[in-house]
UniProtKB/Swiss-Prot annotation:
<dbReference type="InterPro" id="IPR004045">
    <property type="entry name" value="Glutathione_S-Trfase_N"/>
</dbReference>
<dbReference type="Pfam" id="PF14497">
    <property type="entry name" value="GST_C_3"/>
</dbReference>
<comment type="function">
    <text>Conjugation of reduced glutathione to a wide number of exogenous and endogenous hydrophobic electrophiles.</text>
</comment>
<feature type="binding site">
    <location>
        <position position="8"/>
    </location>
    <ligand>
        <name>glutathione</name>
    </ligand>
</feature>
<feature type="binding site">
    <location>
        <position position="43"/>
    </location>
    <ligand>
        <name>glutathione</name>
    </ligand>
</feature>
<protein>
    <recommendedName>
        <fullName>Glutathione S-transferase</fullName>
        <ecNumber>2.5.1.18</ecNumber>
    </recommendedName>
</protein>
<feature type="domain" description="GST C-terminal">
    <location>
        <begin position="81"/>
        <end position="203"/>
    </location>
</feature>
<dbReference type="InterPro" id="IPR040079">
    <property type="entry name" value="Glutathione_S-Trfase"/>
</dbReference>
<dbReference type="InterPro" id="IPR050213">
    <property type="entry name" value="GST_superfamily"/>
</dbReference>
<feature type="binding site">
    <location>
        <position position="39"/>
    </location>
    <ligand>
        <name>glutathione</name>
    </ligand>
</feature>
<dbReference type="Pfam" id="PF02798">
    <property type="entry name" value="GST_N"/>
</dbReference>
<dbReference type="InterPro" id="IPR004046">
    <property type="entry name" value="GST_C"/>
</dbReference>
<dbReference type="InterPro" id="IPR036249">
    <property type="entry name" value="Thioredoxin-like_sf"/>
</dbReference>
<feature type="binding site">
    <location>
        <begin position="49"/>
        <end position="51"/>
    </location>
    <ligand>
        <name>glutathione</name>
    </ligand>
</feature>
<comment type="similarity">
    <text>Belongs to the GST superfamily. Sigma family.</text>
</comment>
<feature type="binding site">
    <location>
        <begin position="63"/>
        <end position="64"/>
    </location>
    <ligand>
        <name>glutathione</name>
    </ligand>
</feature>
<dbReference type="InterPro" id="IPR036282">
    <property type="entry name" value="Glutathione-S-Trfase_C_sf"/>
</dbReference>
Amino acid sequence: MPDYKVYYFNVKALGEPLRFLLSYGNLPFDDVRITREEWPALKPTMPMGQMPVLEVDGKKVHQSVAMSRYLANQVGLAGADDWENLMIDTVVDTVNDFRLKIAIVAYEPDDMVKEKKMVTLNNEVIPFYLTKLNVIAKENNGHLVLGKPTWADVYFAGILDYLNYLTKTNLLENFPNLQEVVQKVLDNENVKAYIAKRPITEV
C-alpha cells in the first residue's frame, strides 16, 4: 500500500476533500497540518509553493481536483468508463466553479465593491447553482451523478464547510436533496471516524 501524506494548514477548506477521500477508502495517511509560522520554510519544498499537497511514496503533487481524482481511483469512487468519468468531472468542475465564484467575493478587499458583489452572489449566483445541483441530486437518488456514490459526492461534502464559512450561511438549508448527498458521505463509517478525531477548526 502506498504511503500517503496530506500537507495543508490546520483548516478544512481545499484539504478536506483529500482527507475525506482517503478516509472513505480506509487508506491510512499522515495528516500533516502546517502552522503559519512553519510555512515560509516549507513553501520552497512544495511543487508550486502552495498547498494542499498530496505526497505518495515520497512524491509530492499539487492541484486539489487532480489529487482528488487520483484518490478516487484508489478508493473505488471513479467512474466505470470514460463516459462515467466525464459525467463525474462535469459535476466536480461545476462545484469548483461555484466555489471560485464565492471565493472571489469573500476575499474581495474593497468593502464597497464586496458589498455590491454580495448582492449578486446571494440573489443570483448561489440560488442558481444550488437549485441546479439540488435537481441533479434528486434525479440521482441522493447522489450528484450516475445515481451512485462517486468522488463528486465526497468532494462536495468535503468542501461544504468551507463554502458555509465563506458565505456565513448554511447553504443547504433549503436544499434537502443536497443535504442527503452530504449526509450519505458523513454516514460512511470511515469518514465518521476521521471527523471524530480531526482537530476542531473554524474553517
